[in-house]
Each structure stands twice: as C-alpha cells, then as structure tokens.
C-alpha cells in the first residue's frame, strides 16, 4: 500500500482532533454556561452538585455499550459512535428552547427539562470514553495524541463561546435610608443561553461530520472487527512499533509474562499491567474524583463570594486550563510515578485551599478585595490545570498497556468521578453545609 500523502495525513489529524472535540463538548459547555443559567433556574447554587451527580449517573452509558458488545461481538464501534453523536446533537439542540422550562414536583419547582437533557448528554459523553478510543486504537500513536488534543478543544471552544457571550454583570442600587437595598440590576449578556446551546450544537454537528470524513478517508477501519484487531494500521507505519514499545515498557510485565501477540479483552489480559500500572490507575481515579466530582460541587461556593466576575472567570479559565495541559503533555510528558504523585499533591493543596474558601463562604478571606478575586481565579485555573496534566500523562502511560489498560483507565475515570460526586451530594444538597452569598448583600459586616 502506498504511503499516504502529507495532505492526507494533515487532514486525518484534523479530522481526528475534530472527532475528539465532540466527546465531552456538551457537558463542558453546560459547565461553562452555569454562571448564566444559574440565575434563572430554581436550584440556584446547588445546581453544580446536581450536575455532578447526573454526570456520574451517566456511567450507565458504559453498561449500554457493554451490552452492545455482548450482543454484537466483533461488530466494531461505528454504530455506537453514531448513536452517541446523535444523542449529543439532539440533546444539545433541545436545550436551546427547553432549558428554562420549569416543572412543579412535590410542591417544589425544578428545572426538570434542563436536568433530564443534561442526563442524556452525560450518558452520551460517558459512553464516548469506551467507544471513541477503541475505534482509534488501531491508529499510530500520533493520531491518538491528536484525539486527546481534540478532547482539550471540547473544553476550550465552549470557553471561547462563553467569553464571547460576556460576563453577567450586575449593579447594586444605593441603599435607602432604612438600610435595606433593593434587588440587584442585571446587565444582559451579549447573547442568550439559548443561542449558546445553538452554537454548541453546531460544534457537535461538525464533530459528527468529522467522524464521517474519517470513515471515508480510512475505509479499512470500518471493516476491521473490534476483537483481536490491535495491529490494524500499526504494522505499516514506520517507527510505530518502536514508539509503542517505549510507551508500553513502564506498565507491562517482563516480556516472559507478556509474550502474546495482541492483548485480548478477557480478564486474564489484565495481568499485562504491572504494580506501577495499578498505582497509575489509582492516581487516575483520585484525580478524576477531585476534578469531576468534588471540586465542581463547591466551585460556586468558593468563588461567588468574590463576585460574579470571579465565578465566571473561575469556571471559564478553569476549563480552558484543560487543553493547555494537553498541549504541555504533548511536548513534555512526565513518565515518573513520583513526579506525577508530586504534581497530584500540589493540585491537592490548591484544592484544599479552594475547599476551605467554600467552607468559609459567604465570608472567606480577602472577600471584597481585588487580591481575593485574582487569587481564587488563579488557583482554580492552576488546580484544574495541574490535575488535567496528571490525567493526560497518566492516560498516555496507561495506553502503552494495550486495550486492557485503556479499559481499566476508563473504568478508573468513571468510578472516581462517581465516588467524588456521590460524596459531595449530601453536604451540598441535603445537609447544606456550605452557605451561599446573596448579591448586593454584605453578610460580613461587623
């Protein structure tokens, strides 16, 4: 087979990146739009905790994909990917007209439409973890790095939309003689949340079109069954075997214990993972619990006391730190377990300070000062950026273990996210451990 031209390779990398962009764009878009929608939805400051639980429950999508593989073994990933993309496009498109629709349940008003559609999108995004990567596992490692770059874009592009939308500003009216101020005056955003969800739908349509373009450029991928097809396109790519061997060596047992051809998906294949690989899986689960469950649940409590501007910037810049960490990992990849552990400890220290701010809400340190606002925004960006780098580096190292390692990595991510979200739901939504701060009211005055 003739070597592909440079133009074809560049186009393939672009399509792979756009394909990866659609993996978590829907949920990331909802997170960065929270500063806007939280003003109109009855859940208020508890909404991030609700969303964390819904995203964790989206792990049911993994069960659906597993059932598909049992009922249709060897059929490949094309149909599940198309279903995932269809759910993402339709769910996001329905958010545009329905996100403000409210329903009375048990005597209380809830944003049932918004939460239900978020759950559908969570199902699709969680299922993408176990459908997209197996489809691309037959490609050489450079294409997989383009895919991870695309996953970074799934956070960056919604952030760009949010920045273009503008920060929700408000003006506090002068306090009258009796000392009771009137309601705050909100300034409208440049465009509505409905328009934001419409633009997000367009991004998901582009991602789905990129997948169809991949099927046209790489027709051999469609006919290769999922089971036992680990070699795929790798054999014809110069230098790929050497690179994969280099990436696999930190995680695999000695060659005498891993002498098989391609890893099989049965449980015995997990013996390919070494003790170091198990430590990496634990690190991946821990960072996922913090970034996908614990920290998002308290982001509003830690940043909103410093103002809506601080909250919006913390959400947007925190999400934008993800693709920046991906860029860094593409150039500088930490392969040391001690180094990754040290970075995780640094991120944990940042997260502990942010958790302390949430506990001390509505009167955390430096509230009402520019220094406090800058500090909380910078710490959110650094904390999520450090954890994102650790997750990317850990996943890259685990990729060397083959399909069993990728499966274990996906399970670790989802289990960690679930545990983090479930842990934070009672203190935020049931016991009300964290206290919110009302606009234009200063509860910190002596």
UniProtKB/Swiss-Prot annotation:
Record's keyword annotation contains Glycosyltransferase:
no
Membrane topology term? Multi-pass membrane protein
Region annotation (Disordered) maps to 228-267
Q: Name one GO molecular function term.
A: virus receptor activity
- Report the transmembrane regions from the record: 14-34, 47-67, 79-99, 104-124, 147-167, 196-216, 278-298, 313-333, 340-360, 367-387, 405-425
Glycan attachment sites: 129
The protein's name in its UniProt record: Solute carrier family 52, riboflavin transporter, member 2
- What are the top taxonomic ranks of the organism? Eukaryota, Metazoa, Chordata, Craniata, Vertebrata
